[in-house]
Amino acid sequence: SKSAAKIPAGSRIVCAEQKGSRVLICDASISDWNKEGAILWEWSPSSDTAIAPEHRKWFNCLSEVKPVKNATAILVTASGGGVALVDIKKNKASFYAFDSGNMHSACLLPDGNIVTASSDGDHICLFDIKNGCPSPESAKKKIYYLKFAHAVVWDKKRELLWAMGLDEIAAFKYAQEPEPILEKVDSIPLSGAAYD
């Protein structure tokens, strides 16, 4: 297509394929992703030996994928309640855990900890993983109320976490010591109901 011809060679698109429950990295210059060479890398929770078989259901209906760590890893969330940090080179999750259903978004904080947004639980969740996490069940986490939480993003310039809920965008200050904690410092009201 004409639009694909304008995309610079080497450009990549990272996407979640819900039907096949896969994360894909595709060549953005190829308009037909069924063509050979279009899919450059893929990950599936069902084939990742780092994810226990009984936990794979947490990754039903992948909802968001973000390249992180200078595009050496992918941060994955799923409506089934799972979050995973997948090492691209190893094609394995270096961390994964469960929070609650309808997890929509995640972001990596500057120290390597992870925040997720879940609408079923009406909250964002701070996972303390920087010092290791021996198992998904033992993941240290803190919950912060945010009605119908749908999105989280780290603002490097302002050093704030922005989180979108049903009727507000909330700003959280992040403190790493003595232990990781979020503090709500601002809120921007939204008119109507926010959704994705």
Regions found by a protein language model. Give the residues of each.
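Short loop/turn segments immediately following beta-strands, especially the blade-tip
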Residues: D27-N34, D128-P134, K173-I181
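Blade-loop segments of beta-propeller domains
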Residues: I39-V83, I88-S105
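Conserved beta-strand positions in repeat-built beta-propeller and related beta-rich domains
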Residues: C15-K19, D27, L75-G80, T116-D120, ...
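Surface-exposed loop and turn segments in beta-propeller and other repeat-based domains
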Residues: E36-W58, N131-C133, L182-Y195
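Repeated scaffold domains used in trafficking and secretory/extracellular systems
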Residues: K2-K6, A52-K66, S100-L109, L146-V153, ...
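An edge-strand/N-cap motif at the start of beta-rich repeat modules
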Residues: K2-S31
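Short coil/turn segments that connect the beta-strands within blades of beta-propeller domains
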Residues: G10-R12, N70-T72, D111-N113, K157-E159
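Structural signal for beta-propeller blades
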Residues: V23, G82-A84, D122-I124, I169-A171
